[in-house]
């Protein structure tokens, strides 16, 4: 989404996988996907190499003075999606998750870092932590084509008119609606054609989904999955 909005990616851009991404001594593993992949297929098959390329292009965008400035722009988009911040749900102790500011990397690497240094962030690993609520909320943003409502815990709804306006105020992201259609197409393919989400396929219901991996420092990694249906509404 960020790459599309920033103009460094189009749905037709193709990148090779070859079991991962390698550049400047940095290696990121992946499955051996049919190459080259376009965006649609990369989303459906969850190709690490593809999104590593996109992330690097965002940070190295010539409109920014440095990859550090590009990273901070990327981070601002991520925060608009609800990551690295509290969503405001009605439960005490809501976690913010983690999306580091550039100052963190400046301190760790003494200001000597670039896109390759933080490449693991491109696939949601490294210095990234997200709550399940944030992931569900992001699925809602995609389904809504660019906005979300603050999630709340409710007992019941008596009618549309009974809901206070403050609970019906949408929060918009800076990404154009058209770009979400591109992502939804890939998420639909992931479930209904040749992607990683085929177990979620339901006859007669256009389920859209995306798989992920949550790293576990104490044992096996965990699978994650977000989805919504039907895709067109």
Can you annotate each of these PLM segments?
Residues 2-233:
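Beta-lactam-recognizing serine transpeptidase/beta-lactamase-like catalytic domain environment
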């Amino acid at each position: 989404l960020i790459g599309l909005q920033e103009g460094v990616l189009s749905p037709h851009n193709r990148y090779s996988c070859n079991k991962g991404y390698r550049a400047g001594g940095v290696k990121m593993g992946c499955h051996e996907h049919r190459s080259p992949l376009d965006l649609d297929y990369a989303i459906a098959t969850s190709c690490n190499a593809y999104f590593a390329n996109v992330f690097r292009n965002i940070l190295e965008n010539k409109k920014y003075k440095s990859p550090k400035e590009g990273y901070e722009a990327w981070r601002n988009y991520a925060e608009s999606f609800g990551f690295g911040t509290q969503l405001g749900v009605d439960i005490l102790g809501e976690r913010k998750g983690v999306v580091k500011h550039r100052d963190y990397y400046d301190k760790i690497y003494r200001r000597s870092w670039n896109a390759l240094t933080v490449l693991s962030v491109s696939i949601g690993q490294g210095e990234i932590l997200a709550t399940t609520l944030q992931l569900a909320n992001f699925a809602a943003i995609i389904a809504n084509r660019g906005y979300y409502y603050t999630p709340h815990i409710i007992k019941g709804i008596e009618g549309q008119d009974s809901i206070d306006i403050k609970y019906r105020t949408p929060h918009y992201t800076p990404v154009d609606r058209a770009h979400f259609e591109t992502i939804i197409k890939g998420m639909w393919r992931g479930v209904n054609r040749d992607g990683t989400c085929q177990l979620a396929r339901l006859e007669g219901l256009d389920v859209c989904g995306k798989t992920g991996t949550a790293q576990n420092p104490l044992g096996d990694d965990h699978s994650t999955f977000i989805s919504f249906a039907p895709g067109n509404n």
